[in-house]
Amino acid sequence: MDRLWAPWRSEYVGKESPPGCIFCAALQNNNSDEDNYVLLRTGKVFVMLNLYPYTNGHLLVVPKRHVGELTTLEKEEAFEIFQLTQKFIQTLKLAFKPEGFNIGANLGKVAGAGVPDHFHVHIVPRWQGDTNFMTAINNTRVMSEELKTTYRKLKETIKNI
């Protein structure tokens, strides 16, 4: 039997969640956007790479305000979230040439939200055949690019949008 080793997953699976909100922590550290994989900050929203992505280029669009419910977003926050979602779909198209996207939010822990108390939208680029047997049978994802490489590629590409 062949084995695929993904030791980076043990960091996610085995660690305890730090106290506080990971999004708020990333937002507070203004001097280290690259270390936190924050790609862009606007007035009410920011965009960052998912630290445990489903595919290369998996992004999170997050309101700066710590708010857990879609229904409690301010109109300006909702507008900026979807404005940046559009902008980063264009960015991902240029940088990675995906064939499609999944866009969505998991509202509540039972719905699959990893950070249920801070609303965020996922942008997941998709390619034909990217969900093969590895994900379905082995609960494993094969990532072809490191997060730092993805971050730098998107930081450069966003300048052209």
What are the residue ranges of the model-derived segments?
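HIT superfamily nucleotide-processing domains
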Residues: 1-161
